[in-house]
Structure formats: C-alpha cells, structure tokens
Amino acid sequence: MGVASRREAEDWIRAGRLTVNGELAVLGSRVGRTDHLRLDGRLIHRHEVVAGQVYLCHRSPGENLRTPEEPSEHQALVDRLPRRAGNRFITVSPMPRIDGGLEIVTSDGGLAMQLQRTVHALSSEFSVRVLGEISEPSIQAILEGMLDRGEKLQVENCEAGGGEAANRWYTIVARGGSGKDIRQLFERQGAVVSRVLRTRVGTLTLDRALSRGQFRPLTKEEIDALISPPAADAAEADAEHSE
C-alpha cells in the first residue's frame, strides 16, 4: 500500500479504523489500486515515496524556479537543489516572485500532480505586510474573500499582528488561496502590500530554522498528511473541481 507497515495496517483493521469502499476492512482482505481506503474517515492516497526522487520544504526568498539557461543576478533555485534527481523540479503552488515563504518542491511528477489538487482542500496561512493599519470594515471585507475575477475565496481568519516602523503585519488563513489571491484581497481594500509570506500549508509549517533560499527534506509523514487531507476537505475539493 505504500503508506504503512503491515503491522500498522493490521492494528488499524483490528481497531476498526480502516475501511475499504465504505466497509470495515478485515484481516486478509485484498486491496486493488481502484479501491478506496479511508483511515478514521480520511481518504488514503496510495502514493509511494520513490527512491531517488527529491521531496523538499523550501523557504522561498521570492523567486521563480529558474533553469541555468535563464540568466539571473541571483543563483537559480535549481542550482541549489540536489543533483541526484537531475534538473527537473516542480514547485507546487509557487509563491509569486515578489513574495516568498513556504513552498513544496519535488522531482516526482506523480506526487506533484496529486499535491496540485489536494492543496486546494487545505487551509494555508499567510503573513501580509502592509503600510499602516487596516480598518475593521476592511478586515470584514477581506474575510468575505471576494476576488477581482468574481470568484470567492474561503477565508477562515484575518487578524493584526506586530509592526515595524510604518509597516504592519496581518495573519490570514484561507483555504486553497494562492499568494496572488491573498495580495489581491488586501489591495482591493486599498492596502499597500509590500510582502506576502506563506507560513503554513495544511499541517506543514514554515521551518523558521531555514534561512531564505534554504530547504530541507520532507518526511514521509509530512507527505502523507499533504496528500491525504481530512475526508470532508477532500470531498469539498472534489466538488469544487467538478464545477
């Protein structure tokens, strides 16, 4: 199955935590690739971590995933990544070049495709730096989540944080929002935004020990949590993609 050891799976079955196609799993059951498995109601996406592939948590300083053929005054991200998987890397839901923060980078195309879908079912947290303070009516308008193109973003929270000189930081939590969407929510209220940083995707948080431009390997547990969001969230994402 690629998501647990045999002993762990047997423990889940005995505890009645694992279902196959809506039915409680029993010891000795055979599971095919088209069967739907859920653990505690949470859909299990059976993606195996592939040996030799690279799975990274990257603290983006605000840049595109450039190749060596695209000159830049800064060292390209691809030049800093591990060489063993070649030079083909994919950034999942990349932050705009002028912003930065948490990004997921992988050389595994199959995983990248799954993550592109599931990240829209997960709540993400952003820190937004603006000039001056935002009024309470503007905060309420941001919470409504209306975007320029007429779409509506599900904003779960928006609150003021600290400040530095004339700038103020705001923390916003939204489901499936991109860095561009978050910036747009604030600019629609007349805010002058100088920085948008993504600090969390689902349960994966930005590692503050990482300097800008650095990365660390993702653990298997972190990957599993990203590709297997809670059942209710996955169902919501499916509904959005079917519209």
PLM feature spans:
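Basic, flexible Lys/Arg- and Gly-enriched helix-loop patches that mediate nucleic-acid binding at interfaces
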Residues: M1-E243
